[in-house]
């Protein structure tokens, strides 16, 4: 598929979004690039929330131990790699929660459409914790629009959302005309269209954002 430079620029501007982080009850970081989790943990360390929930996909599990999780003194780090071994590879997905009491993890139910799967699991997690009334959602700036679409369709309208973009993964030396970035934007644009159709069967509760 061929996209002109002008069209790619328009797609990028249309997709990109991000809000200033603010104090909340929990931070949720979607699976994907490592910088998302580093940024989320930075916000957690700066006191933006008393807890953080990290979504860890199958391709992140092996290197997850490299993240600077806030383990209490004397606590043995969790071993996601061992926990994942008996699980079929396509179903290896975990939520890792960190708060003042320590670090724990749970398996994310299998399902299609990764981002929607994560937000539905987040809805279940929040439903078990009624004290969570506000969230900062962390992902890449081009992914957040699709994330917001899922949140509006799945999460309770009472939850107050802030969508924070993680730092850029890097800028192209040729001004952003590189083929990988073009393909990434084009694919995200197509995914957004697919999700719009899929989410028509969900009730959209008009969540608050901003």
Give residue ranges: language-model regions:
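A structural signal for short, hydrophobic/glycine-enriched beta-strand patches
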Residues: 2-179
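Amphipathic, soluble alpha/beta structural segments
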Residues: 65-67, 206-210
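A transmembrane-helix-recognition feature enriched in membrane-embedded lipid enzymes
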Residues: 177-208
């Amino acid at each position: 598929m061929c996209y002109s430079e002008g069209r790619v620029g328009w797609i990028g501007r249309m997709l990109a979004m991000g809000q200033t982080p603010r104090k909340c009850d929990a931070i949720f970081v979607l699976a994907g690039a490592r910088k998302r989790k580093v940024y989320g943990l930075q916000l957690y360390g700066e006191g933006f929330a008393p807890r953080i929930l990290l979504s860890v996909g199958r391709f992140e599990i092996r290197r997850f131990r490299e993240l600077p999780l806030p383990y209490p003194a004397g606590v043995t780090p969790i071993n996601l790699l061992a926990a994942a071994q008996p699980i079929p590879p396509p179903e290896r997905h975990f939520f890792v929660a960190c708060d003042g009491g320590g670090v724990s993890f749970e398996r994310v139910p299998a399902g299609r459409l990764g981002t929607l799967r994560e937000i539905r699991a987040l809805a279940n997690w929040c439903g078990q914790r009624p004290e969570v009334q506000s969230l900062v959602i962390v992902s890449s700036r081009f992914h957040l629009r699709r994330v917001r679409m899922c949140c509006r369709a799945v999460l309770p309208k009472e939850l107050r959302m802030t969508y924070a973009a993680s730092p850029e993964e890097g800028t192209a030396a040729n001004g952003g005309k590189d083929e990988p970035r073009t393909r990434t934007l084009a694919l995200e644009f197509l995914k957004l269209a697919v999700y719009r159709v899929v989410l028509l069967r969900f009730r959209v509760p008009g969540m608050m954002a901003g």
